């Protein structure tokens, strides 16, 4: 019976697919762009995903085996302007109308990007096939020549101010002998190296101070690279050169509005920039992150400006956000068994409860279900509270000053009264969380989970007995222990543009700690075991 229903469902889906037109709404002479295909003729290992973003016109996305049902919905409208047609256009997705004028710019984009990747003299040929108002564009790519770096000459300012720091960093230089020459590699090295120098006091040094020139004529297929750091930028001349020097922090100002009622010590402790310290860009960024984690602030700005030939001033500007508020929510529901329900919820928050940036959250929830003309009913009540401190409590701050600190205490209670059982659930946790660069961590030295069951209906218990994990949640529990999570990612962007990797490790430990309280717990004379209740 089940297999027959599956066959019917597949048949209906196929019928809908076949009868669905994705070009019905197109005008005469128009076609829908269905696909962009990239084929690299001379290197099957080359990832076409590197150049796909540089094609200017993209086809509609697909969901099911290359089919987009929203295209069909849109095309139900045809050329009509009826109410149904307008609804179809609003709910559906319009087809991408093929535009042949976008092909030539796409070819130019691909060639330029291949040159950026180190393929010089690449060719791209585009061809279009159109059948029944459906167009497919194929880009045949022949990768150009690559040059191997056979040697590198470093040229630093004659003053020698960069020599010591540059030599200390040579092991981390990305451009090495034997690699393929590419603008992308040189640009990445410019960013990396300039960031390194700005960590070591060189406030004015940027990636635009880096110049590269390559000799590709002396040895066929190879390039001799000159790696130069100049005291003027790429859009300047030698007349604009300003000698590099190390800078130090001078005056530090923390500015915030009068309505920000917070202890000044809290703001000072979050600041990692101190007068007399050598300029370090990472310290500035870390200070910004620490202030941004403070929920009481709506905006944070850390401005660093040169004050004289060897010092900079830092101005930290803070803006206050809404301090407190509450939310009331009521939902009504019904189900096929005739049960009616109402679920009220009330939440309250305060972002500065003790005038130190502490965030208090309180939540009250309820769920009441009943059946008209019947005694069947259920009641669920819940309350939860949490407070978050913008620091590590009971932990030496200096040991973790590089991290964005947070300490959170949470507790909750949930009461459930149903015809099958009465259940009480209590949870509590005390823990630390923070982040440093690409690493995020959370550690709970203590966490508690208590489940207490009363008036269990044995018939109900038998119906769920086949599911071990579900059954375990309907027995008494008292779990007390510790736990934590470590998360590392290679990309911290909100919207990553490339693939990335991450590592996540979780651990929980519970049980043995309770044995410390055995002398205080009642003992069963028959079994010799201690019990909590």
Language model regions located:
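Beta-strand secondary-structure signal
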Residues: 111, 136-140, 224-228, 313-317, ...
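C-terminal motif of bacterial Sec signal peptides marking the signal peptidase cleavage site
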Residues: 16-19
